[in-house]
């Protein structure tokens, strides 16, 4: 069997345990990118403590469950999964566990060797003993306590029994079973089961192995057993016997390998002293010092001890506690004050009538502050909010409001389900008889030493510690249970819950000089990832722009009748429109299979797909039942998608007409004057939405690339670390000519939502058509579609979508994709070179129209390795008289499109230490002051991997301006190898708090060093400039990830600085207005910091005894900048937090862009 080999990388717990990342972990390579499925500004960066307790009692040697069937080992039906759930199930795939080794300091993972059917190991971990399953097989009853016990039935070829009787047939009636010999196709699966799953111990070893092998490196893990004296002390560091140094350490390197070695060598014997194990785990959390659970780097560095670090205990057993003691009294029935000042009085579902139970211990270690000397900053986990009744919310055991250092315990019982009858177990912690406990109709059974009621104590303990209980009876259920526990922990390692965050502001074109309108998107993680699109009117009051709310798409959609039955939700189809309704009956068999998966149970197949379709359409009847989550609104979170408005024609007629002389743009534009306006925006509910100007949803589209994870939106755990991105890209709208007519086309991208692009013809909003979709099946080098596409007319006479290939593609390459707008065919893929073994991908391009005729000539884009590339989109004729001619050069010219400069970058961005600086935002272009070529302005920074959530204060990110002199269509076979030494440095010299006409602001002042472009003889002296994002040499982790705006003699940009406190979420933003020709301070005032509606000296700052222009100001809001015009006709730049009037400078040259045809998006 082919093994899977890869290395482990760092990521966040929540991301690593989300389904998509977990499933892909087996095939990723060493340098794989960890694309976050959480908004990074909400992620807190402290990994949890995970304490693992496994049962090594003698009963773990049993090859059956439950204990009550022990006397049936010599009966035929003992070999039936229907009677003995531990036995081979032909419908289950028994995966090989993973073998971890340390090679040259790197953890390597591969499958354990597959057992041979004719010589299968009795223990696949130790590869000891063997049996020929083709002729010498006997059913195992017990294995692993120094002796083996097998059925007395005669040895034979491996077999199993199917239950073939009627439903009334007694399960101990041998006539109800039919013997099946293992077929040739089943042999490997049976051998895997025999060697790695057939006993409780083997199944536990394998299940834990498969769950933990993909756990991220920054999780901190310790382990213990119940009995083994060498390994029954949590975090002791014991290396005796087979404990392999169980100190609490980061789950990396040798410590990671030690954990799997410990699993491999598990031996069984003795009783079930669970309470002592619980005590050891709880008391360990009180430990101080370098080996304590809150040490910064356990074993190396104690301080700082982060007060937001959660701690989780996983307790697995197959039996009932016995032969031990606890000393906490009747903790769950005794009144007490909690560390946050709340008072507890005996109440359901916590209380019972027994002392010193496992449940008492669990409550004690939840309610006690393990480290009162540390601040209480654990994040509350409230997946079931109840604003109307805060007390009920606090005491709901599904929530964990504790902010103090405490222990949450997850319990896992093996082979115990049939004993859970009163209260009745129905598959999950908070269902079945649990409701009778809450209502007071039942009490928790009294637990005592070796009592059969102790099985309920496992359930009760999970409730008391705000964890969960899992009951498994078969190996496959055990594998799923371990994985579910890690998924639940990842849900508590969730992004911070935040109220509505405004993420984008976009004006529309339906207003006039007196009233303007704008759309604002927002999301609220504290409301189960609710999203909204709000329309505002914009007016000026007291010289400031005032927003007046007109409607909320969220409210209108939630008020929709009939559970979403009337919504027009479309997906790819085969009709003339290329679309079909999203209904259960319209789905293919494979699509129905994808929706028939339970996201809360590791995608186990179920039959709820039709209900999931109804849920996604807006039907709310299944919420908070049937394991479907509760939504605060139907509209999902809108985080990175900026709305695009479509009303009148996109271009000015006199500019558009010459591009396509055969088309009559004026006629098209006249027809669009009466087109019903629409606003389109993507949301993380799986859809692109279209709304009219009254806020009614008129259209929604589900891209094929997100379909495979639509079912996750129904998950109970979605409110935590299970959040996913879907249609998170900003739609791009443009008018284009194809098929003999003008059309209005929308290009959609997904960002972290998936690897896909789509094009819709939205010319007629009542008759939208799907032009095409592109995914990895069509283009393997397509990664997550973070880059923003551009629609352009090219020299081959075709309209095209030009975009970067995105990140985390199959081969981690970077390439410019040129896609035929009409058909979706890849016209050209221009692949660039890069460093091998380092992930790469091309970011958003900026197109240049050198002669302003509306046809793109060049494209500029950066990549993750810090290279700035130029692409020539012109014919390859060196002596062509007019390489930029609008004339159609014919389809063949596309073969001449190429990577400029002989395949070399225009510039490679590195910091002062020589480390590459990733480029993820589109460059901006301005004409060089000499009128020769462009200054290509770009910034560096990356903000989409989990590790990017925390500020990197070890290095600076940078804004560059690089002179590209070879822009006359010449055959540019090479470019000068530029370094920082060829550039003029600018600096941020001052950050200060100041007041401008009663408006308080924090501002920055940049240097104003001139750039000496030319020597006296006309040769090049300096080739550009750079500005490191740091104030007076202080690094804050500031970076540029949003597109810039070049207007007149100023370049406007917004940076982001992640929070450098790992116990805090959020990010800060700075808006800059700089001189694009020098990268420094402008000679004129840029921002209306005094909020007057005009820009004058009242917004200047006194610096070095003179009034100077402010270079940057801190602003609230996310999503980059939008350029608009205020009521006085002056330009203004808007973030999601506020709008600032800007001055583009004296004798402005107007907007610099790739072409004079401007879209409204």
From Swiss-Prot:
Please tell me where Ca(2+) 1 binds in this chain.
598, 600, 602, 606
Q: Which residues form the signal peptide?
A: 1-30
Q: Where is this region: Disordered?
A: 1136-1161
| Protein's cellular compartments | Fimbrium; Membrane; Cytoplasm, Cytosol
Q: What does this protein do?
A: Involved in pilus assembly, twitching motility and adhesion to host cells. Primes type IV pili (T4P) assembly and is required for inclusion of minor pilins PilV, PilW and PilX to the surface pili. Stabilizes assembled pilus fibers likely by antagonizing retraction mediated by PilT. Calcium-binding and calcium release by PilY1 seem to be essential for twitching motility and for regulation of pilus retraction dynamics of PilT.
Another remark in the UniProt entry says: Residues 598-606 comprise a calcium-binding site which together with the other one (residues 849-857) seems important for interaction with integrins of the host.
The entry sums up its family as follows: Belongs to the PilY1 family.
> Know the name of this protein?
Type IV pilus biogenesis factor PilY1
Origin organism is Pseudomonas aeruginosa (strain ATCC 15692 / DSM 22644 / CIP 104116 / JCM 14847 / LMG 12228 / 1C / PRS 101 / PAO1)
- The gene name on file is pilY1
């Amino acid at each position: 069997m082919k093994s899977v080999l890869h290395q482990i990388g760092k990521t966040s717990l929540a991301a690593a345990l989300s389904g998509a990342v977990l499933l892909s972990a087996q095939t990723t390579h060493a340098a794989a990118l960890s694309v976050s499925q959480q908004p990074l500004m909400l992620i807190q960066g402290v990994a949890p403590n995970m304490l693992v307790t496994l049962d090594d009692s003698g009963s773990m040697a049993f090859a059956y469950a439950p204990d009550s069937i022990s006397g049936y080992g010599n009966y035929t039906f003992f070999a039936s999964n229907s009677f003995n759930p531990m036995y081979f199930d032909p419908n289950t795939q028994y995966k090989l566990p993973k073998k971890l080794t340390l090679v040259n300091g790197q953890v390597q993972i591969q499958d354990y060797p597959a057992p041979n059917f004719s010589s299968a190991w009795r223990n696949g971990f130790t590869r000891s003993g063997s049996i020929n399953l083709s002729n010498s097989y006997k059913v195992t009853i017990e294995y692993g306590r120094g002796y083996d016990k097998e059925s007395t039935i005669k040895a034979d070829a491996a077999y199993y029994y199917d239950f073939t009787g009627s439903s009334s047939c007694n399960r101990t009636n041998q006539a109800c079973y039919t013997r099946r010999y293992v077929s040739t196709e089943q042999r490997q699966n049976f051998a895997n089961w025999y060697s790695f799953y057939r006993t409780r111990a083997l199944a536990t070893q394998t299940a834990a192995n498969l769950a933990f092998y993909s756990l991220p490196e920054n999780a901190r893990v310790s382990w213990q057993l119940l009995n083994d004296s060498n390994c029954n002390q949590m975090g002791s560091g014991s290396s005796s016997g087979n404990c392999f140094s169980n100190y609490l350490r980061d789950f990396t390197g040798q410590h990671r390998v030690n954990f799997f070695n410990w699993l491999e060598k598990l031996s069984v014997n003795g009783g079930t002293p669970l309470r002592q194990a619980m005590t050891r785990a709880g008391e360990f959390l009180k430990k101080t010092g370098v080996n304590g659970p809150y040490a910064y780097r356990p074993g190396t560095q104690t301080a700082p001890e982060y007060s937001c670090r959660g701690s989780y205990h996983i307790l697995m057993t197959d039996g009932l506690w016995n032969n031990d003691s606890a000393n906490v009294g009747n903790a769950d029935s005794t009144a007490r004050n909690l560390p946050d000042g709340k008072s507890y009085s005996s109440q359901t579902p916590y209380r019972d009538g027994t002392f010193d139970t496992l449940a008492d211990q669990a409550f004690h270690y939840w309610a006690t502050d393990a480290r009162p000397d540390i601040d209480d900053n654990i994040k509350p986990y409230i997946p079931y909010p109840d604003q109307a009744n805060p007390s009920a919310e606090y005491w709901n055991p599904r929530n964990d409001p504790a902010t103090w250092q405490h222990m949450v315990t997850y319990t896992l019982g093996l082979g115990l389900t049939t004993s859970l009858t009163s209260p009745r177990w129905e598959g999950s912690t908070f269902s079945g008889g649990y409701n009778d406990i809450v209502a007071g109709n039942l009490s928790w059974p009294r637990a005592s030493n070796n009592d059969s009621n102790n099985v309920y104590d496992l359930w009760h303990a999970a409730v008391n510690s705000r964890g969960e209980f899992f009951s498994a009876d078969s190996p496959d259920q055990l594998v799923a249970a371990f994985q579910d526990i890690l998924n639940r922990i990842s849900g508590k390692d969730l992004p911070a819950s935040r109220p509505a965050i405004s993420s984008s502001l976009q004006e529309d074109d339906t207003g006039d000089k007196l009233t303007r309108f704008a759309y604002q998107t927002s999301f609220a993680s504290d409301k189960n990832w609710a999203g909204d699109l709000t329309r505002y009117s914009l007016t000026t009051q007291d010289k400031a722009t005032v927003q007046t709310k007109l409607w909320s798409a969220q409210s209108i959609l939630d008020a929709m009748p009939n559970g979403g039955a009337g919504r027009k939700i479309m997906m790819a189809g085969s009709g003339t429109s290329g679309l079909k309704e999203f209904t259960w009956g319209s789905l293919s068999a494979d699509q129905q299979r994808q929706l028939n998966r339970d996201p809360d149970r590791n995608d186990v197949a179920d039959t709820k797909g039709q209900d999931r379709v109804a849920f996604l359409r807006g039907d709310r009847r299944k919420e908070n039942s049937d394991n479907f989550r509760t939504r605060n609104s139907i509209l999902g979170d809108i985080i990175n998608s900026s709305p695009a408005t479509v009303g009148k024609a996109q271009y000015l007629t006199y500019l558009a007409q010459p591009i396509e002389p055969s088309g009559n743009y004026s006629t098209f534009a006249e027809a669009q004057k009466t087109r019903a306006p629409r606003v389109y925006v993507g949301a993380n509910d799986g859809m692109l939405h279209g709304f009219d100007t009254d806020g009614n949803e008129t259209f929604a589209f589900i891209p094929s690339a997100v379909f495979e994870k639509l079912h996750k939106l129904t998950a109970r755990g979605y409110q935590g670390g299970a959040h996913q991105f879907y249609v998170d890209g900003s739609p791009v709208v443009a008018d284009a000519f194809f098929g003999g007519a003008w059309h209005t086309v929308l290009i959609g991208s997904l960002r972290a939502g998936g690897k896909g692009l789509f094009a819709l013809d939205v010319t007629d909003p009542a008759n939208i058509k799907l032009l095409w979709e592109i995914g990895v099946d069509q283009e393997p080098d397509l990664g997550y579609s973070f880059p923003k596409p551009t629609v352009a007319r090219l020299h081959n006479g075709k309209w095209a979508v030009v975009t970067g290939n995105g990140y985390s593609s199959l081969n981690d390459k970077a390439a410019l994709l040129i896609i035929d707008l009409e058909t979706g065919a890849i016209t050209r893929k221009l692949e660039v070179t890069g460093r091998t073994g380092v992930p790469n991908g091309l970011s958003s391009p900026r197109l240049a129209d050198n002669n302003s005729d509306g046809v793109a000539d060049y494209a500029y884009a950066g990549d993750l390795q810090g290279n700035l590339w130029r692409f020539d989109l012109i014919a390859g004729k060196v002596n062509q008289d007019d390489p930029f001619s609008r004339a159609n050069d014919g389809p063949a010219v596309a073969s001449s499109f190429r990577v400029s400069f002989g395949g070399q970058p225009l510039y490679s961005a590195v910091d002062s230490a020589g480390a590459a600086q990733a480029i993820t935002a589109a460059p901006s272009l301005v004409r060089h002051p000499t009128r020769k070529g462009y200054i290509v302005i770009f910034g560096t920074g990356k903000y989409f991997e989990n590790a990017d959530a925390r500020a990197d204060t070890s290095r600076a990110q940078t804004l560059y301006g690089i002179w590209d002199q070879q822009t006359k269509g010449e055959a540019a076979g090479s470019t000068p190898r530029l370094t920082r030494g060829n550039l003029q440095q600018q600096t941020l010299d001052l950050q200060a708090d100041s007041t401008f006409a009663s408006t308080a602001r924090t501002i920055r002042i940049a240097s104003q060093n001139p750039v000496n472009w030319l020597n006296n003889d006309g040769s090049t002296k300096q080739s550009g400039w750079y500005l490191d994002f740091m104030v007076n040499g202080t690094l804050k982790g500031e970076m540029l990830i949003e597109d810039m705006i070049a207007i007149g003699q100023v370049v406007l940009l917004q940076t982001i600085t992640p929070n450098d406190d790992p116990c805090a979420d959020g990010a800060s933003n700075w808006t800059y207005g700089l001189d694009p020709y020098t990268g420094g301070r402008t000679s004129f005032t840029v921002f209306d910091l005094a909020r007057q509606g005009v820009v004058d000296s009242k917004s200047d700052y006194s610096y070095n005894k003179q009034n100077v222009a402010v270079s940057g100001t801190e602003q609230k809001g996310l999503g980059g900048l939008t350029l608009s015009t205020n009521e006085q006709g002056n330009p203004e730049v808007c973030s999601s937090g506020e709008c600032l009037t800007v001055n583009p400078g004296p004798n402005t040259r107007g907007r610099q862009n790739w072409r004079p045809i401007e879209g409204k998006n």
